[in-house]
Amino acid sequence: MDLIIPKDYDPKLSIRETQEAIRYIRETFQDEFGKEMGLNRVSAPMYVEKSSGINDNLNGYEKPVSFTMKDMPGETIEVVHSLAKWKRMALKKYGFGLHEGLYTNMNAIRKDEDLDNFHSSYVDQWDWEKVISKDERNEKTLKETVELIFKVVKHMEHEVWYKFPNAVYHLPDKIHFITSQELEDKYPELEDAKDRENAICKELGCVFVMQIGDVLKSGKRHDGRAPDYDDWKLNGDILFWYEPLQCALELSSMGIRVDEDSMVEQLKKTGDEDRLKLQYHKMILNKELPYTIGGGIGQSRLCMLLLGKAHVGEVQASIWPDEMLKKCEENGIHIL
């Protein structure tokens, strides 16, 4: 358990005012995001069959919450980690065409999460996915989409400032781009990727770190990524320097999704070629699924960022270790 306690923390809003601000941010953002990105809202599952291969393996070691159902004997059901793969299949199932897309409210349980100021076992995010052409699977498409998302987030700052002027946290005016290898080259003295993210975000304010998942020159990965949804050459994280906690805050992980070639290449690198026999993977190999770009935007993270909160538990209801709750309360951090 890692917990940062900011000095002389002032939550600015009462718990009830915070709840009202959360409602406003969530409702306003999803409407503006959907409109700006050209996305339709759809309903999404909270759990899927393990045999489908649809669940997100995240970094590879997290185990999903699973159970069995009376009317589906012999089938293991898993609570989703994310909807990264499900969304791509939904675009096909619902008949979405080129440059059309969807977003959904995704709720997940990640029981193996390391709990801290930003991380909870309960995950709530806007999961989105959009159809692109094979020719658009490039860095230009990725960067243009990142710029669009940043524009919506920045506009939300002004919306919140108007409604809650004393509480809003001000954001930088521009997002910068750097690859994970360029970041390692820039800070050779910093061995930990998180330290490099903190350094670049403190310098530039907001950064999109690109190309996450593959091994760097150092022999290490910047961060783990499942080999079967993001193309590791065309993905990244949106990070903000977060002054209240003096570190980087990751708002979104996103990317252009694997095609039939990059998926096989990445599965070979991780030794997960056995997944190629699963339904989702077969559909990609057979070119039955559309080429897409997609990602997730943390709902609680966005609320935390825009309201300058010290702990994600101030903007979402979850469960936390007693020691963490005690320290938070002693320092004016009111956990819901």
UniProtKB/Swiss-Prot annotation:
Q: Which reaction does it catalyse?
A: L-aspartate + NH4(+) + ATP = L-asparagine + AMP + diphosphate + H(+)
Annotated keywords: Amino-acid biosynthesis, Asparagine biosynthesis, ATP-binding, Cytoplasm, Ligase, Nucleotide-binding
Q: List localization entries.
A: Cytoplasm
Q: Which GO terms describe its molecular function?
A: aspartate-ammonia ligase activity; ATP binding; catalytic activity, acting on a protein; transferase activity
Q: In which pathway does this enzyme or protein participate?
A: Amino-acid biosynthesis; L-asparagine biosynthesis; L-asparagine from L-aspartate (ammonia route): step 1/1
Q: A biological process (GO) annotation for this entry?
A: L-asparagine biosynthetic process
Q: Which InterPro entries match?
A: aa-tRNA-synth_II (IPR006195), aa-tRNA-synth_II/BPL/LPL (IPR045864), AsnA (IPR004618)
Q: Which domain of life is it from?
A: Bacteria
User: What EC identifiers does the entry list?
Assistant: 6.3.1.1
Can you name a GO cellular component term?
cytosol
Indicate the family of this protein: Belongs to the class-II aminoacyl-tRNA synthetase family. AsnA subfamily.
What NCBIfam families does its record include?
A: asnA
This chain belongs to the protein called Aspartate--ammonia ligase
Its gene is asnA
